[in-house]
Amino acid sequence: MAHKKAGGSSRNGRDSKGKRLGIKAFGGERVIPGNIIARQRGTTWHPGLNVGMGTDHTLFAKIEGVVEFHDRANRTFISVRPVAAQAAE
């Protein structure tokens, strides 16, 4: 008699969830201390002035100010430029 071999279970069909990496505060955006500027794996972007880096390479603001991107020596740095305080009226 002709028999069909039992179909095995597929070894494909799995996928991991997206990790929501990338820039969270773009150039020109105002940030306050502790705001996350970028989530990344490795150092796609490097911390510049007034920016800290977490153990998972997350970049965050250390002061209140405006986010700036600048390139130097084949690297992209992210800095936070302080905003001049408003004159009291």
Curated annotation (Swiss-Prot):
UniProt keyword annotation of Ribosomal protein present: yes
NCBIfam families referenced in this protein's UniProt entry, alphabetically: L27
Listed GO CC annotations: cytosolic large ribosomal subunit
Keyword entries, A-Z: Ribonucleoprotein, Ribosomal protein
InterPro entries given in the database record: Ribosomal_bL27, Ribosomal_bL27_CS
Name under which the protein is recorded: Large ribosomal subunit protein bL27
A biological process term (GO) from this entry: translation
A GO molecular-function descriptor: structural constituent of ribosome
Gene for this chain: rpmA
Entry annotated with the keyword Ligase: no
Coiled coil residues, start to end: none
Entry similarity comment: Belongs to the bacterial ribosomal protein bL27 family.
Signal peptide: none
Chain positions covered by the region annotation Disordered: 1-21
